[in-house]
């Protein structure tokens, strides 16, 4: 179990506990439940890297304490 953070840079930081085998799409669904926004409208980025829904956190080498940038589309 790892804990990751999503920051929308508007004052909202979301902590999420998930497994390394979860996909980015699964992570978006968990975040959407906490913020009340549809998961289809969430975009997770880090720098210029946009994370794709079907790839696992382990494949992206996301570790405990990782910070995502949360954007709305």
Swiss-Prot record:
PANTHER family (UniProt xref): UBIQUITIN-LIKE PROTEIN 5 (PTHR13042)
Organism annotation: Debaryomyces hansenii (strain ATCC 36239 / CBS 767 / BCRC 21394 / JCM 1990 / NBRC 0083 / IGC 2968) (Yeast)
Keywords assigned: Ubl conjugation pathway
GO MF annotation: an example: protein tag activity
Gene (name only): HUB1
Domain of life: Eukaryota
Protein name: Ubiquitin-like modifier HUB1
Signal peptide range: none
CDD domains: Ubl_UBL5
A Gene Ontology cellular-component term: nucleus
InterPro entries: Hub1/Ubl5, Ubiquitin-like_domsf
The organism's taxonomic lineage, starting at the top: Eukaryota, Fungi, Dikarya, Ascomycota, Saccharomycotina
Domain called Ubiquitin-like: residue spans: 1-73
GO biological process, one term: cell morphogenesis involved in conjugation with cellular fusion
